[in-house]
Swiss-Prot record:
Residues passing through the membrane, by range: none
Name the record gives this protein: Heat-inducible transcription repressor HrcA
Organism name: Bacillus cytotoxicus (strain DSM 22905 / CIP 110041 / 391-98 / NVH 391-98)
The organism's place on the tree of life at top rank: Bacteria
Gene (name only): hrcA
GO-annotated molecular function: DNA binding
Taxonomic lineage from the root: Bacteria, Bacillati, Bacillota, Bacilli, Bacillales
One Pfam entry name: HrcA
Keyword terms of this UniProt record: Repressor, Stress response, Transcription, Transcription regulation
Gene Ontology biological process terms from the UniProt entry: negative regulation of DNA-templated transcription
Family membership noted in the UniProt record: Belongs to the HrcA family.
Amino acid sequence: MLTERQLLILQTIIDDFIGSAQPVGSRTLAKKDEITFSSATIRNEMADLEELGFIEKTHSSSGRIPSEKGYRFYVDHLLAPQRLSAEEIVQIKDLFAERIFEAEKVAQQSAQILSELTNYTAIVLGPKLSTNKLKNVQIIPLGRKTAVAIIVTDTGHVQSKTITVPESVDLSDLEKMVNILNEKLFGVPMVELHNKIVKEVVTVLHKYVHNYDSAMKILDGTFQVPLSEKIYFGGKANMLAQPEFHDIQKVRSLLEMIDNEAEFYDILRKKQVGIQVNIGRENSSMAMEDCSLISATYSVGEEQLGTIAILGPTRMHYARVITLLQLFTKHFTEGLNGLYKSK
């Protein structure tokens, strides 16, 4: 159990190191207004904190830096909520006020804004497409044998792909087919499309479309849509601006992981409800052992739809990042609940 004096010194060391990226010595602490102890007392308390594993020495300085254990204690016990500026709050509210009818655009824009507000890398796992409902289908001819099939969902998700159009299918059949699909499938959840097509759409197509077999090939190509979530990044290169990552060899594996994206998809998909903070080696990937990942989930009702996360050095502005994530997920969840209730 740490004493009040040790708690104050530990918090001051971590706050100072987060801001400066420089090891903190007893002389630096003695100049702080909140530290009223003698230099000898400060040195003794720092020695005790080091022995307890909360701070550690560096090779290049006589000062101390927080250990992973120190950061974990700081996050769990010493953090105080940080106030955002009025301009920042307005910027966030404007995002959700303008585009909440298109959830994926909000997710994409959220990643960009969060990266700008934190100077870290922001990652947003978009809403699950499986929870979306079909809003519109379009099949637009590109030439004699190809067309682009466009699927739009109720959350603004747009999925497009190029499909092959058999020569036996004319524009009249294509138009009839699109009209039937929109009439029969509007408002149907994406996960139920296949059953709906088999039970109802196929019969109608057989009745009204001349080249039925060819129409079915187009149908198969149009609705081969992945139902997995999309992942959006903001500030992928921001880690390079951090002093800890000026050594390219040290950060290479992390940059490769960020560029690949797939690992983060797996990590964020497993996140539990609420705010989670993973520090250093608490992360599942060795490439992230010098990083902290703070994540928060957003939802509709009791259903978790996605995750917003910030990746930065262990020397992260934890209070600010957590406050931002709480505000983003609050507005995202409120907006999505309003969006789904209005349907």
